[in-house]
Amino acid sequence: MSIKISRSLYADMFGPTTGDRVRLADTDLIIEVEKDFTVYGEEVKFGGGKVIRDGMGQSQVTNAEGAVDTVITNALIVDHWGIVKADVAIKDGLIHAIGKAGNPDIQPGVTIIIGPGTDVIAGEGKILTAGGFDSHIHFICPQQIEHALMSGVTTMLGGGTGPSHGTFATTCTPGPWHIGRMMQSFDAFPVNLGISGKGNASRPAALQEMIEAGACALKLHEDWGTTPAAIDNCLSVADDYDIQVMIHTDTLNESGFVEDTIKAFKGRTIHAFHTEGAGGGHAPDIIKVAGLKNVLPSSTNPTRPFTKNTIDEHLDMLMVCHHLDPSIAEDLAFAESRIRKETIAAEDILHDLGALSMMSSDSQAMGRLGEVITRTWQTADKMKKQRGSLPQDSGDNDNFRVKRYIAKYTINPAIAHGVSKLIGSVEQGKMADLVLWSPMFFGVKPDCIVKGGMIVAAPMGDPNASIPTPQPVHYQPMFGAFGGALTASSVVFCSQAAIAGGLARKLGIAKKLYAVENTRGGISKKSMIHNDATPAIEVDPETYEVRADGELLTCAPAEVLPLAQRYFMY
């Protein structure tokens, strides 16, 4: 016997279904469910008097026979490929299936088998996303990693050795010894990690030894001298080893202008950091490279989005990060040349057009690593308010815009850095790095963070209380963040050459090493999902006005942002 219920009651019980719309936190962004993989009347739900009980929604199938380890029930998946309702299965630390969970002995349409060995995470009324990937990390202090994880970031790539002055300014881990010690420390942290070696050298030998020592990328930074010779050499070595190169170009234009840097690229693929320029790069026109087919451009989050306070905070921030002295006129001029309201405003619009492909933090070095996800959605909301719906959206929802923006901190950095076969999206066969959100807290405060199939972090109440919810509630590491579970549920990225050379044995690393691949000629701007636009970008050297395909790109700074103070009163 079947029974009809209202859509609102159904959504309360099992979460939204096809055609239902959901607001993302306090933004103006609205998503609409495109498809529901569950079966009406056969939904599975855990709890007293609910469906997932022996002989009902739970079968007798063993895990060895095909039952899954964990099922996230009735979740609303938001990913670059779609916005759909489904049950999500996890098995052996991987995403096993996306579909309909239950007991195939008595239920129709079951594609995910629940057995006695299956645990349940309730996803009803929740949004499920892939874990975030921050590809611009200054490893200044280990405490960063917990802050990033609690925000929903499960993968971090960058360079540094701790609070050295080289690390304060540059995302580079220099030399085999430092790389080895940093990689050994990574066994302590429940996230995927990768090291970028220093790429500033005019001859290949020093770069080769860093890659073979474990670097999964090389970073060219102006503070170490990003000359055309260093650029050319670094890209040549990267081509030989199939690793990515990230670049922070020459703000002072000492060794050449943006055209000289582009010439040194020789059409080769490169990841351009803070492409707008406030974080560093040829003044005032580094933003031009966002229109090139071989450049994979990203932003760092302090300029995201452009607000009434953005300019004021940047000058002091820059002086500290780059070891400058405000009493020296040349240092002050260097700082002021980088902070331009015109290019920061254009950055907002280039993100909305899909010309800027990725978002990152620049952690503690002109960036806030716990705010990559929040600032991505603040930018999307600001653009919705100022520019209206995108042409690809119907007007009733913002599905395409949401897919464009979520790709900026999930799948696109994974593609850029050669790890998209393992992470970056909610897809079958990938590592189960997943984040569950309540819609009202989307992009700000996750409900649960799953790493390699195991809950690794979550908000938790008083451990001495009789139930999990009494105040004070804090984000805390969970069992997946300890002991052997930690090292079994995350990886360290490196080059194939490092693995072939027996690096794990040499360093005694417990985490699995994962080789990056397809980072060079096999990818280009066209590989950046929903963010592959290549407009012709021009910058007026006198006014700093930015035009894309002849159109002036400008917008007002935001006076008020969503996902801000109302979420952080305590």
UniProtKB/Swiss-Prot annotation:
Pfam families on file: Amidohydro_1 (PF01979), Urease_alpha (PF00449)
The record, for Gene3D superfamilies, names: Metal-dependent hydrolases, Urease, subunit C, domain 1
Q: Where in the cell is it found?
A: Cytoplasm
GO MF annotations in UniProt: nickel cation binding; urease activity
EC class, as a word, reads hydrolase
| Identification of the protein by name | Urease subunit alpha
The UniProt note on the cofactor reads as follows: Binds 2 nickel ions per subunit.
Which residues catalyse the reaction? H322 (proton donor)
Q: Which InterPro entries match?
A: Amidohydro-rel, Metal-dep_hydrolase_composite, Metal_Hydrolase, Urease_alpha_N_dom, Urease_alpha_subunit, Urease_AS, Urease_asu, Urease_asu_c
Record-linked SUPFAM superfamilies: Composite domain of metallo-dependent hydrolases (SSF51338), Metallo-dependent hydrolases (SSF51556)
Disulfide connectivity?
none
What organism is this sequence from?
Rhodopseudomonas palustris (strain BisA53)
Q: What is its EC number?
A: 3.5.1.5
* Gene that produces this protein: ureC
Residue ranges constituting the Urease domain according to the UniProt record:
131-570
Its assembly, as annotated, is: Heterotrimer of UreA (gamma), UreB (beta) and UreC (alpha) subunits. Three heterotrimers associate to form the active enzyme.
Keywords associated with the record: Cytoplasm, Hydrolase, Metal-binding, Nickel
Catalytic activity as recorded in UniProt:
urea + 2 H2O + H(+) = hydrogencarbonate + 2 NH4(+)
Which positions are annotated as binding substrate? H221
